[in-house]
Amino acid sequence: MKAKRIVFKVGTSSLTNADGSLSRAKVKEITRQLALLHEAGHELILVSSGAIAAGFSSLGFKKRPTKVADKQASAAVGQGLLLEEYTTNLLLKQIISAQILLTQDDFADKRRYKNAHQALSVLLNRGAIPIINENDTVAIEELKVGDNDTLSAQVAAMVQADLLVLLTDVDGLYTANPSTNPDARRLEKIEKISSELIDMAGGAGTSNGTGGMLTKIKAATLATMSGVPVYICSSLKSDALLEAAEESKDGSLFLAQEKGLKTQKQWLAFYAKSQGEIYVDQGAADALRNNGKSLLVSGLVSVLGSFAYQDTVTVYEDGSGAILGKGRVRFGKSSLKDMLKSNKPKGVVIHRDDWISLTPELNDLFAEF
C-alpha cells in the first residue's frame, strides 16, 4: 500500500468505558495499530478526544461533569494523563509523539496558522506522531472549534493530508438511524455532499461526547472542499485503523473535490471574519458566479459595515439578497463610497485570487466559524 499522510480522529465514545472513564485497553489498541501503520511508512496525526474522561475521576467527580468550569478542570488534569497513555505505549515501539493543543484562533489568525503548519510539518518529517486536541482548559466560546470532528478536518486541510479518518461508534453514514430503522442503508461512497445529505444526517451523538453525525458531515465538507477524502468507520471493529487506512468497504467514503481549495482559499472560506457587506448588480453577480471574474467597482450597488483595505467582506446580489461569496477588498469603505460617486467608477474591488464563492448552504453550515 502506498504511504499516505493520514489524520485519524478518535472520539470520546471510542476511548471510554461504560461509566465514561478512560479505557486504557482501548488506548493501547489504538497505539498498536498506529505503530503498525507508522512502521509501514505512513505519516500519521492523531486528533484525540478523551481529556475530560481521563481526568474527571482524579478530581473526585463520580461521573463526567456537565458544568463548563468542571469540564475545563477535568481536561487540565486529563490532558496530561491521556498523553502519558499514548506516549508510553508509542515509546514501547520506539515512536516519538508530540502534544499540540489548538483553539479556533490558531486557524483564524494567519500568523498562528502558519506557525502551527510549520510545527506539524517538522514533526511529520522527523517521524513523530502529533497528538492533537482542542485546548479545552483555556478556550473561551469565541475561540472554540467546538468538536474534534471539525478540528480534525481543519488539521487535515492544513497539512494537505491524503486521508482523514473519523472513527466513531457507528460504521458510517446511513440513510436513517440504523438502531431504530431496520431499512436503514449505509452509504459506501459519497461523491457530493448535498443539502439533502446534511438534512439526513440529523443530530444526536452519545452522552460521553459532543459529536453526532451532523458534525461529521460538516467536517467532511470542509475536508473534501480542501482536497482531502474522508472515511467514516467504526472504532469497535478489530483493526479498525488498519482497515481504514486502506479505505475498506466497512465504512462511508467521501470523495475529495478534484480541485481542492488552496490554503488562501481555505482561510477565506472557513476562517476569515467578514467586516462588511457589498451588494452588486446582476451583471457583476453573473461574472462572479459563472465566469470566474474579479469584482469591479462598476458592479457595486451599495456598501455596508466598517472595513478597511485588505479586510474580508461578504458579497450579495442586490435585489435577491443571495450570497455570492467572500473576498479581501483592495479599497476601504470610505474610498469605495467616493468612487461610486464618479460617473465612470473604475478599479478592482476584489481580485479573483482573493475570492471564494459560497452557496447559502455552505454559508449556513460554517456560520459559526
Curated annotation (Swiss-Prot):
It holds the Pfam family AA_kinase. It catalyses: L-glutamate + ATP = L-glutamyl 5-phosphate + ADP. The gene is proB. It is found in: Cytoplasm. Belongs to the glutamate 5-kinase family. GO terms for biological process: L-proline biosynthetic process. Its EC number is 2.7.2.11. GO terms for cellular component: cytosol. It is an enzyme of class 2 (transferase). Its main location: cytoplasm. Substrate binds at residues 49, 136, 148. SMART domains: PUA. NCBIfam families: proB (TIGR01027). It comes from the Bacteria. GO terms for molecular function: ATP binding; glutamate 5-kinase activity; RNA binding. Residues 275-355 form the PUA domain. InterPro entries: AceGlu_kinase-like_sf, Asp/Glu/Uridylate_kinase, G5K_ProB, Glu/AcGlu_kinase, Glu_5kinase, Glu_5kinase/COase_Synthase, Glutamate_5-kinase_CS, PUA. SUPFAM superfamilies: Carbamate kinase-like, PUA domain-like. ATP binds at residues 9, 168-169, 210-216. Keywords: Amino-acid biosynthesis, ATP-binding, Cytoplasm, Kinase, Nucleotide-binding, Proline biosynthesis, Transferase. This is Glutamate 5-kinase. PROSITE patterns: GLUTAMATE_5_KINASE (PS00902), PUA (PS50890). Pathway: Amino-acid biosynthesis; L-proline biosynthesis; L-glutamate 5-semialdehyde from L-glutamate: step 1/2. Catalyzes the transfer of a phosphate group to glutamate to form L-glutamate 5-phosphate.
